[in-house]
């Protein structure tokens, strides 16, 4: 599940609004995120060029691009039709408006940095990016570092949007493949379901409480935000099964949306 992490030191340095309060009041939106990110970017070495050595409002790995903004806005590339099959859902005016605004926003490379995983992670724990968008599991990588950070759900598009919606990155999933020539689908399905239920009953809660809340997160507010994150997320068939790689190529989405 993708989410935001924010740097508390930079938040305090630039006297920015409390993001936890914004989330609770339903005011944590794409525009608010961009406003805060813009205030926190800086050319640290004064060479009039923004490079990996400078400070940014938000950093993300280049293989992900702006997808979290899109899903957080409540949009998807595919929807399920009346026959239970996926079909494109790109035709709405809202989709076009969101796409254009996200494209124009993240094209500001003085504020938004896209790069290799290790670069954006280092940028965050060295306190050179206010926001960092990654999968939840990545928060564990910050344990060796002293950076004071908190968790946030993906931003809503507007305050009028009812819920905060999280994006499940299909590249981080481990699907179960069942052979087409399987002669006992019912038995196989029963076993797979049993394993899934056992994982939920015996693994999810201990991981949630012992690892995340007990060792990774650094304040009670992040635990509150985590509850929001894990209780409302979406999958997109186009991302999950690669039905429309021409439009939704994960590795090239950032390049597509900024060109």
What do the PLM-derived regions correspond to, one by one?
Residues 1-21, 59-83, 170-179:
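Periplasmic solute-binding protein
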Residues 62, 133-139:
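Beta->alpha turn/N-cap motifs
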Residues 205-259:
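C-terminal capping/gating helix-and-loop segments adjacent to ligand/active sites or protein-protein/ligand interfaces
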Residues 20, 43-54:
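Acidic, glycine-anchored loop motifs typical of Ca2+
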Residues 143-212:
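Extracytoplasmic/periplasmic substrate-recognition and gating elements
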Residues 34-39, 68-116:
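Glycine-centered hinge/linker elements that transmit conformational signals in sensory
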Residues 34-39, 117-132:
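Short helices/loops that flank or line small-molecule/ion binding pockets
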């Amino acid at each position: 599940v993708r989410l935001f992490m924010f740097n508390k030191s930079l938040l305090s340095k630039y006297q920015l609004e409390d993001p936890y309060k914004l989330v609770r009041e339903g005011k944590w939106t794409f525009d608010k995120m961009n406003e805060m990110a813009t205030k926190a970017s800086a050319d640290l070495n004064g060479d009039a060029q923004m490079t990996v050595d400078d400070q940014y409002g938000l950093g993300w790995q280049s293989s992900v691009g702006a997808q979290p903004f899109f899903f957080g806005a409540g949009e998807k590339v595919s929807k399920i039709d009346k026959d239970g099959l996926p079909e494109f859902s790109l035709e709405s005016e809202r989709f076009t408006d969101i796409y254009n605004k996200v494209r124009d926003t993240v094209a500001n490379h003085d504020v938004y940095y896209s790069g290799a995983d290790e670069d954006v992670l280092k940028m965050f724990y060295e306190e050179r990016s206010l926001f960092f968008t990654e999968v939840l599991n990545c928060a564990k990588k910050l344990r060796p570092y002293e950076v004071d950070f908190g968790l946030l759900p993906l931003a809503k598009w507007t305050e009028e949007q009812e819920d905060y919606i999280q994006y499940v990155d299909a590249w981080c999933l481990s699907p179960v493949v069942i052979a087409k020539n399987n002669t006992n689908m019912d038995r196989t399905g029963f076993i797979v379901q049993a394993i899934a239920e056992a994982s939920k009953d015996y693994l999810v809660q201990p991981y949630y409480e012992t690892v995340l809340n007990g060792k990774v997160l650094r304040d009670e507010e992040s635990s509150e935000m985590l509850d929001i994150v894990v209780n409302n997320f979406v999958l997109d068939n186009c991302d999950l099964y690669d039905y429309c790689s021409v439009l939704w190529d994960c590795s090239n989405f950032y390049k597509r949306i900024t060109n």
